[in-house]
């Protein structure tokens, strides 16, 4: 009996040791690929299967580290086989993973694909990572021809847009701020939100930007966001008037139900169009 227990204990120790060695090897390979991007160490099928087993194990409660490594290895595997569309599926909504993958793949992922990935990550905490921000800043030349397909019809064909921004930066620094919006209510909402969570006093800026200088337009979160770098002009500071009651109602209606969310998106577009027409008629946009 004691011999069996000893053998079992020895097997467990060996398994723990082998797990430790494998995790360290995976971590080391990722770090090497991140630091030296000229030659990428391809993840092995054994490493991926090892992580899959850990992620599926009911005996392990905290699996986030293993998921973190797994996403990177699968993205590396996709980039090394030229499966560009697959890369995003492994890092969607994971800005930290995405920043690492973009750095590792900077020499092999085509620039337009890097642009697409960086823009999708930027709007979801990606502004915290230089690897993402630097691609966004230099992304204008990789902007697709249909970059404005999600833009409201009432402004889509304009050559120049009026944009707004809430920020703590001084007016002379605002030109290099990446995130602006077509809708003043969005900027007013961000100003209130930032101050509510203890950030510095927010300024509300208004500017114009040529369509040719826009890096991207995104509306995945109903923020009507214009992404730019150094393209805005005629910047002025506006008095804060607060968020409109209609926008507050719209924001409070945010839903994770797909059909309800689609309904809210339509409502947002309608409200924006109404606001745009009213202010355009008054010459205030």
What are these language model-derived features?
Residues 2-162, 169-178, 184-285:
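Conserved NAD+-utilizing ADP-ribose enzyme module
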């Amino acid at each position: 009996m004691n011999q069996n227990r000893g053998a079992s204990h020895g097997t467990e120790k060996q398994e723990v040791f082998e797990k430790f060695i494998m995790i360290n090897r995976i971590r080391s390979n990722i770090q090497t690929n991140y630091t030296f991007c000229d030659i990428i160490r391809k993840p092995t099928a054994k490493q991926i299967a090892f992580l899959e087993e850990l992620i599926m194990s009911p005996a392990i409660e905290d699996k986030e580290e293993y998921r973190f490594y797994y996403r990177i290895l699968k993205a590396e595997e996709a980039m090394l086989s030229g499966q560009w569309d697959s890369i995003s599926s492994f890092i969607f909504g994971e800005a930290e993973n995405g920043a690492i993958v973009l750095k590792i793949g900077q020499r092999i992922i085509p620039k337009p694909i890097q642009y697409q990935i960086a823009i999708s990550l930027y709007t979801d905490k990606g502004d915290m990572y230089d690897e993402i921000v630097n691609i966004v800043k230099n992304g204008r030349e990789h902007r697709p021809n249909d970059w404005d397909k999600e833009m409201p019809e009432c402004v889509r064909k304009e050559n120049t847009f009026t944009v707004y921004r809430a920020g703590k930066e001084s007016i002379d620094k605002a030109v290099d701020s990446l995130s602006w919006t077509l809708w003043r209510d969005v900027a007013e909402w961000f100003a209130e939100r930032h101050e509510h969570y203890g950030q510095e006093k927010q300024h509300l800026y208004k500017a114009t930007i040529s369509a040719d200088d826009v890096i991207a337009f995104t509306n995945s979160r109903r923020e009507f966001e214009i992404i730019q770098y150094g393209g805005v002009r005629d910047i002025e500071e506006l008095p804060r008037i607060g968020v409109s009651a209609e926008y507050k109602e719209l924001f409070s209606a945010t839903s994770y139900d797909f059909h309800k969310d689609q309904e809210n998106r339509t409502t947002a577009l309608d409200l924006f169009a109404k606001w745009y027409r009213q202010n355009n008629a008054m010459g205030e946009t």
